[in-house]
Amino acid sequence: MRLVKPIFLCACAVVLMTACGRMDKGAQMKTENTQINQFTESAFDADTKITDVIRDPAFGDYGRLLFPVDFEIPDNLKLKDVREILPWYSKINTDKTVELVNTMKERAQSGEQIFYDIYSDAEKKADPEKKDTGLFFFRGDAGAKTAIVNAGGGFVYVAGIHDSFPQALELSKKGYNAFALIYRPGAQTACEDLARAIAFLQEHASELQIDMADYSLWGGSAGARMAAWLGAYGTSYFGEADYPAPAAVIMQYTGLSEVTGNEPPTYACVGTSDGIASYRTMENYIARIKKNGTNAQIEVFKGLSHGFGLGEGTVAEGWIDHALTFWEENMGDQK
């Protein structure tokens, strides 16, 4: 009996020590998980580093495609400084940039797939440059019409954060399904990627719950040329199967002058102070499309320079509503 008490006490001590150890480990794991959740769930703001957005776990491997992959982004650059990696652009709205990355993060965290590859692993292995392509999905209503938005960047880089993501987000708010394409810089490769994107969406429309009938192609600067070229020449010209032409092409600030006679209905807008895309060239382009009997429209905004995006707070504010109305008016007239 004398031995029972010490043994019992020792056993209790071991149990208590083990339990405490488990509690300590549990508390440590809880603390670590809390820290991870705090990092993952915290909202971005104007002072958030761009590299922190890119590396956020919510975005996985595609976070790098949120910003131009063709430029080295300094680690100290913040969201409020994004204009420093967007040459040729103006009227960059920090509040919109913050809204965009927060919206995309929230959707990704909720389990929504917001990014889609357009090339297979085998295709990307054969051509590593195809790794830097894909579609960001700004989901609207299930079964709603589809817009594909292409940012510019002079075929040197892709300015999606200012020239396609904001437009796609606004279209999704109005119920439309909008995709922002990240493509390989270069006129030919960019058009090949857009043709592939159209093919991908046509082939996966059912599972994506989108309507590709009467789809539209949108673009700014170089992205506008892509939209116009695919609209006029078609997907087969750029290596894909022959899919229907868009119901409308929506172009911003590009000095394209070539008219083939196969252009879809086209809306354009540009500023009078654009030193890259002459508004007179765009006026002439639209006039020639109209002369061919195709519906076309242009808005010219006094004093605006190149790359004004949504044009919030400028004389161009609201142009996207006019473009949307133009698209809607031309639905049902696909070639």
Predicted regions mapped to residue ranges:
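Short beta-strand element of the alpha/beta-hydrolase
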Residues: 144-153
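Short amphipathic alpha-helix adjacent to the substrate-entry channel of hydrolases
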Residues: 160-179
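C-terminal catalytic histidine-bearing segment of alpha/beta-hydrolase fold enzymes
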Residues: 32-63, 292-335
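Conserved alpha/beta-hydrolase "acid-adjacent" motif
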Residues: 275-284
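N-terminal targeting or regulatory segments adjacent to alpha/beta-hydrolase or S9 domains
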Residues: 6, 14, 19-132
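Short beta-strand/loop motif that positions the catalytic acidic residue
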Residues: 268-270, 274
